[in-house]
């Protein structure tokens, strides 16, 4: 299991939101490229970038920052989400050196777009499913749909999706532990690898994820915990490596 540091981009800065609310953000750095360097030097093997402005506007806003990070670390797998709603945007990021693009809102509203993207960019597409009480949320979490997460995840199995990033909105940015039972259930219900996201606070939460013994969980995204110092990236990754030998 990989520990994946999150860099959330808002107005060119690195921030964290509480429960997806743009008005409730904390700025952690005005230099996201330097922040990426910090996590790389700390031993991370993958980075999770989110264009928050892009998620709300439906098109890339902080793309220049994403490109700068991808070009600085050409051998580091980078995944980007937020505002990815066209094949042109995916092509732009892939050409810039980004390893994976995360399709969120568009995947819920137009599931056929995921299949189209997977055909055009095989191995490059991740689906981001954000949920509240098991139901998918869209548009920067502003809307909660009547679609169940597990049902939608199964629909993407035949498309060739590389992974699903599952975020429990109620947990995100609250550092109260992630929704392990549902994350494990999702991993068991689909053949697509799952990346857990939202609510990780400390090493105990990583241990709890490992204790779930769900082989389909391949990563855990962490944000506020590593910025506020309650979780150390290198220590958490070492724990995962030891447990999964």
UniProtKB/Swiss-Prot annotation:
Keywords of the record: Amino-acid biosynthesis, Cytoplasm, Histidine biosynthesis, Isomerase
Record carries keyword Cytoplasm: yes
Record GO terms (molecular function): 1-(5-phosphoribosyl)-5-[(5-phosphoribosylamino)methylideneamino]imidazole-4-carboxamide isomerase activity
Pfam families the UniProt entry points to: His_biosynth
Active-site residues, as the UniProt record annotates them: 8 (proton acceptor), 130 (proton donor)
EC number: 5.3.1.16
InterPro entries found in the cross-reference section: Aldolase_TIM (IPR013785), His_biosynth (IPR006062), HisA_bact_arch (IPR006063), Isoase_HisA-like (IPR044524), Isoase_HisA-like_bact (IPR023016), RibuloseP-bd_barrel (IPR011060)
Gene3D superfamilies: Aldolase class I
GO biological process terms held by the UniProt record: L-histidine biosynthetic process; L-tryptophan biosynthetic process
Presence of keyword Cytoplasm: yes
Subcellular location: Cytoplasm
Pathway(s) of this molecule: Amino-acid biosynthesis; L-histidine biosynthesis; L-histidine from 5-phospho-alpha-D-ribose 1-diphosphate: step 4/9
SUPFAM superfamilies membership: Ribulose-phoshate binding barrel
Catalytic activity: 1-(5-phospho-beta-D-ribosyl)-5-[(5-phospho-beta-D-ribosylamino)methylideneamino]imidazole-4-carboxamide = 5-[(5-phospho-1-deoxy-D-ribulos-1-ylimino)methylamino]-1-(5-phospho-beta-D-ribosyl)imidazole-4-carboxamide
GO cellular component, one term: cytoplasm
Signal peptide boundaries: none
The family this protein is said to belong to: Belongs to the HisA/HisF family.
HAMAP family hit by this protein: HisA (MF_01014)
Protein's name in the database: 1-(5-phosphoribosyl)-5-[(5-phosphoribosylamino)methylideneamino] imidazole-4-carboxamide isomerase
Species: Pseudomonas syringae pv. syringae (strain B728a)
């Amino acid at each position: 299991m990989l520990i994946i540091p999150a860099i959330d981009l808002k107005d060119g800065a690195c921030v964290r939101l509480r429960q997806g609310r743009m008005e409730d953000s904390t700025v952690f750095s005005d230099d996201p490229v330097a922040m990426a360097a910090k996590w790389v030097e700390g031993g991370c093997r993958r980075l999770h970038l989110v264009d928050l402005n892009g998620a709300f506007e439906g098109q890339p806003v902080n793309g220049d920052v994403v490109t700068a990070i991808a070009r600085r670390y050409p051998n580091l797998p980078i995944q980007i989400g937020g505002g990815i709603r066209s094949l042109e945007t995916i092509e732009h990021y892939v050409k810039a050196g980004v390893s994976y693009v995360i399709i969120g809102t568009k995947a819920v509203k137009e599931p056929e777009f995921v299949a189209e993207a997977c055909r055009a960019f095989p191995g490059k597409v991740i689906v981001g499913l954000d949920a509240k009480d098991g139901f998918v949320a869209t548009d920067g979490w502003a809307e909660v749909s009547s679609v169940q997460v597990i049902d939608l995840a199964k629909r993407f199995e035949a498309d060739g999706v590389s992974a699903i990033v599952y975020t429990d909105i109620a947990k995100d940015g609250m550092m109260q532990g992630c929704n392990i039972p549902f994350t494990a259930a999702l991993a068991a219900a689909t053949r697509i690898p799952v990346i857990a996201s939202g609510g990780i606070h400390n090493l105990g939460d990583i241990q709890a994820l490992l204790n779930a013994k769900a082989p389909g969980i391949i990563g855990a995204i962490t944000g506020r915990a590593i910025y506020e110092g309650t979780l150390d990236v290198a220590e958490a990754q070492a724990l995962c490596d030891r447990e999964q030998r």
